[in-house]
């Protein structure tokens, strides 16, 4: 199950497994890791004298996605009563250490790595799983641990907030850890802070953030109520550089922004009238406002289906256009000749126009050219005279 040299492995698909009990073998580790994905190789370095493994190993998967999935589901689970640490076995892992390492002392024996991680990850990104120092034989905690943060801002906040606080009914102590290759010098010096500020972690090396980051190109302390920032964010989101979003609430637009100038406010003595609303079907139109002094009120609108008449005859229908051949009822008949003239060619005069049949008990009106007929009987009302 062991593989060749590390350089032959796919480092992106290889994970590191630490905190292994002495009972764990390569076959057991294989059976555990195959639950996350297909395993290519398992390597557990062993001591040359005792031939026992040193408590850690490397597992190579078929792809990087399988390795990431194994880290998510298998990190901090207990194997033979000990929580194991699972993370990426990157060749440049040491370059991620900026020196923001803190020491946590006076821990209760019940405190494990997962509890420390859940407690201190609220202050910032933790690069590695918290390391609790344990007894080699029994595996019990020695009462102190080390936590490596990704920035000094996170470590300073954790030190200030957690020093002297109770964790599992014990007041813990939090301070910067001592350096390994120095004599009594702790982490968090000014030189380390300056070096960390000059060489920040690259985004590809930065672990997953617990909270969402600020959009790229926008400072974290920039208020979104600024006009330029609001337009820049909207243009970046929509992909249209010329897009101008509507102003935010409480903002005053500066300038015309390529539009028409705004309408000036009315003078104090004039009350602006609202624009008329078009009447909806089935509603009575709204009456016009009262006229000003010295002005006649406008005429009322005509009823539906009636056309407005000429001035002086409001509401009356217009007269029909004059017929080309005489009054109504004589359509198709030529006009009579003027008095003293005869029809050409000895033509007889046209017959009188025909009127529609009268109703029962009614007499038809006489022709216009004849005088009214005398009453035909007593008690009868004569017909009205013809129109002049």
Curated annotation (Swiss-Prot):
SUPFAM superfamilies: RNA-binding domain, RBD (SSF54928). One of its GO terms (biological process) is mRNA splicing, via spliceosome. Keywords: mRNA processing, mRNA splicing, Nucleus, Repeat, RNA-binding, Spliceosome. The keyword Transport does not apply. It is found in: Nucleus. Residues 13-91, 100-179 form the RRM domain. It comes from the Eukaryota. GO terms for molecular function: RNA binding. Gene3D superfamilies: 3.30.70.330. Subunit of the splicing factor SF3B required for 'A' complex assembly formed by the stable binding of U2 snRNP to the branchpoint sequence (BPS) in pre-mRNA. Sequence independent binding of SF3A/SF3B complex upstream of the branch site is essential, it may anchor U2 snRNP to the pre-mRNA. May also be involved in the assembly of the 'E' complex. SF3B4 has been found in complex 'B' and 'C' as well. Belongs also to the minor U12-dependent spliceosome, which is involved in the splicing of rare class of nuclear pre-mRNA intron. PANTHER family: SPLICING FACTOR 3B SUBUNIT 4. This is Splicing factor 3B subunit 4.
């Amino acid at each position: 199950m062991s593989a060749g040299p590390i350089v032959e492995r796919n480092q992106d698909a290889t994970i590191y497994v630490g905190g292994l009990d002495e009972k764990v073998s390569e076959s057991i580790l294989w059976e555990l890791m195959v639950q996350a994905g297909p395993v290519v190789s398992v390597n557990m370095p062993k001591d040359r004298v005792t031939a026992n493994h040193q408590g850690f190993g490397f597992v190579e998967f078929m792809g990087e996605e399988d390795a990431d999935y194994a880290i998510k589901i298998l990190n901090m689970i207990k194997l033979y009563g000990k929580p194991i640490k699972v993370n990426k076995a990157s060749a440049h892992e040491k370059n991620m250490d900026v020196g923001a390492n803190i020491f946590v002392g006076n821990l209760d024996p019940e405190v494990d790595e997962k509890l420390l991680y859940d407690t201190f990850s609220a202050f910032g990104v933790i690069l590695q799983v918290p390391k609790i120092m344990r007894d080699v034989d029994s595996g019990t905690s020695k009462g102190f641990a080390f936590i490596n943060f990704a920035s000094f801002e996170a470590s300073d906040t954790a030190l200030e907030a957690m020093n002297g606080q109770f964790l599992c009914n014990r007041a813990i102590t939090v301070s910067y850890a001592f350096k390994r290759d120095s004599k009594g010098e702790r982490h968090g010096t000014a030189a380390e802070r300056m070096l960390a500020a000059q060489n920040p972690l690259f985004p590809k090396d930065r672990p997953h953030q617990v909270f969402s980051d600020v959009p790229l190109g926008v400072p974290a302390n920039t208020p979104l109520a600024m006009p330029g920032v609001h337009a820049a964010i909207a243009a970046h989101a929509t992909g249209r550089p010329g897009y101008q979003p509507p102003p935010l609430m409480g903002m005053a637009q500066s300038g015309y922004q390529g539009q028409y100038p705004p309408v000036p406010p009315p003078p104090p003595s004039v009350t602006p009238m609202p624009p008329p609303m078009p009447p909806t079907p089935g509603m009575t139109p709204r009456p016009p406002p009262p006229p000003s002094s010295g002005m006649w009120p406008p005429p009322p609108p005509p009823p539906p289906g009636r056309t407005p008449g000429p001035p002086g005859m409001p509401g009356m229908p217009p007269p029909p256009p004059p017929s080309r051949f005489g009054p109504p009822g004589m359509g198709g008949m030529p006009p009579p000749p003027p008095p003293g003239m005869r029809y050409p060619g000895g033509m007889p005069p046209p017959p009188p126009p025909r009127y529609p049949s009268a109703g029962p008990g009614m007499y038809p009106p006489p022709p216009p050219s004849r005088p009214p007929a005398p009453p035909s009987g007593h008690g009868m009302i004569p017909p009205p005279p013809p129109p002049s």
